[in-house]
Structure formats: structure tokens, C-alpha cells
Amino acid sequence: MNVYTAAPMDLTLSHSEAVEIVLAYARFWLAMAYTIVATVVMFTLTLFGLLVPGDAGRRWQLFCARTWAAGILRAARCPVVVTRLSTAPPPAGGFLYFSNHHSMLDILALFVALKETPFVFAAKRELFKVPFIGWHLRLAGYIEVDRQNRDRAISSFTRAARQIRERGTVVTVYPEGTRSVDGTILPFKKGPFMLALEAQVPIVPIAVDGAQLALRKHTLRLHGHPIRVVIGNAIETRGLAQADRDDLLRRTRLAILDLHRMAGAGPSPIEPMIAPPGKRTGERE
């Protein structure tokens, strides 16, 4: 009888690897300390926007948010590189930005990249409970989405569609509904496309890559890394009905996959396009 023994695995880290791990954790906590201070200061300044009526107040709030985001990314050593495929200005009136989502840094990168017009995010309900950040979200008119309750999520999208039509609001949405952990693009939720069709406004597709290499989901190690943002051409929804939802989802997904490759990312699966019903996430571990 032959007995085979596996060779022991060498788990020893080199000196340079150990130093990089320590520095990655140190960068995270230094950036976190800066974030806390910057959040308190910029939230306080944001309150002045409430005293200014109309678009000027919203622009002030967005200026504060962009300054906050740019400062954090500088502290994290994550420069944002932006590519726009269209030379035309953004669509007039309200419209939707649809972007993939890898990391919390994606949000900051979009604040820096999307300078053309004031916008708000459709954000998960849990963020509205975070001190300072949640208060800013409410004051700035962000769209609250309850991922735990389908009926409330649909209701929030219906209100958002009315706000987009009547006020010309621009909303940024993550159709995956969560962050991917491996850098690929997850299946899309149907709700955001119901919103687009209800509002009858264009979708501007966006791809972001690099943020997942700077700060991965479920980790506290921060690595300085460029974040690339590619902004595509608008996809029109005017005249489409809810029966066209899946086709609109397919066209938008293919557009974002193309932009993602242009950003330098590896291939993402085309299928499945649609996230299974009843599941809050679809993340790949």
C-alpha cells in the first residue's frame, strides 16, 4: 500500500509582501479618519444649500458632495480617469445613469466623473440610517430603495419616476443591486428598468473598473489604484412600454459590458442577464 503525503504549503510572506499588507491596512484607517472628518465638515456646509431655493441649492449640495468625494479619493491615492464616448451634452431634463458596482469607491468616482449636471443616487435603505451620510441623503433628495420589501421598492421607484418627470431630476442607479466581489458584472434587477419605462427618460450607461482593486468588498485593505469611468451614449426609452422591459435590460447590459471592456476590465458573462426573482443579491464569491 502506497501512502502519499502532500508537500507542505509555504505560507511564508516575503518582507515586501508583509510591508504592503501593513501599509494597505494603514491606508484604509487613515482614509477612514479623513472620511469621518470630511463627512462632518461637508455635511455642515451642505446645510447652507437648504437656504438657497431651486437648482442653485442642489448645485451647492452636489459641489459639497464632489469636494468630499475627491478629497477621499486623493487620500486613498485613487485617481479617476474619465472617458466619454459622446461629444453631445447630456440629455435635456431628467434622465438615468446606469452603472455597474464593484466597490464603495465607485460612488465617490461617479461624483468626480459626472460633472455635467446635478444628480442623486438611488440608494439602499440602510444607508439612510448612517449618521451624517444618511442625513445628507434625505436632505439632498436621494431615492430610498428598500431591498428587503419588493412592494416598497416598487413604490419608491414609482415616486422616483414622478420626480424625474416633474422636476427633471437626474438619478444614478446600480442595476445589479449590490457590489460584485470578483470584478465581473452581475445579473441586473428588473426594478430599475421599470423605473426607466415609467419615467420615459433616457438611460446613459456607465462602466467603472479599478475600484475593486483599490478596495474589495468585505476587506479593510486599501491599495492605491486608478479608477476608470467610461460613459456611453444615451439609450432612448420614449414610446416603450413595460412589455419592452427585458429587451431594454438586454440592450443596456450589452452596452455596459462593452464599456466595461473599454475600461480595461476582463470579460463578464452575458448570461444570466436578469437576477432571479426574490433574491436580494446575486453576488459571485
Where are these regions (language model features)?
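Catalytic core of membrane glycerolipid acyltransferases/transacylases, capturing the structured
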Residues: 46-63, 73-75, 89-150
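Hydrophobic alpha-helical segments typical of transmembrane helices
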Residues: 68, 106-109, 132, 191-192, ...
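Generic preference for hydrophobic
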Residues: 82, 97, 121, 229-231
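Non-catalytic C-terminal accessory region of glycerolipid acyltransferases
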Residues: 2-18, 22, 154-285
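A short beta-turn/loop motif at secondary-structure boundaries
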Residues: 86-90, 221-222
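A transmembrane-helix-recognition feature enriched in membrane-embedded lipid enzymes
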Residues: 14-81, 135-139
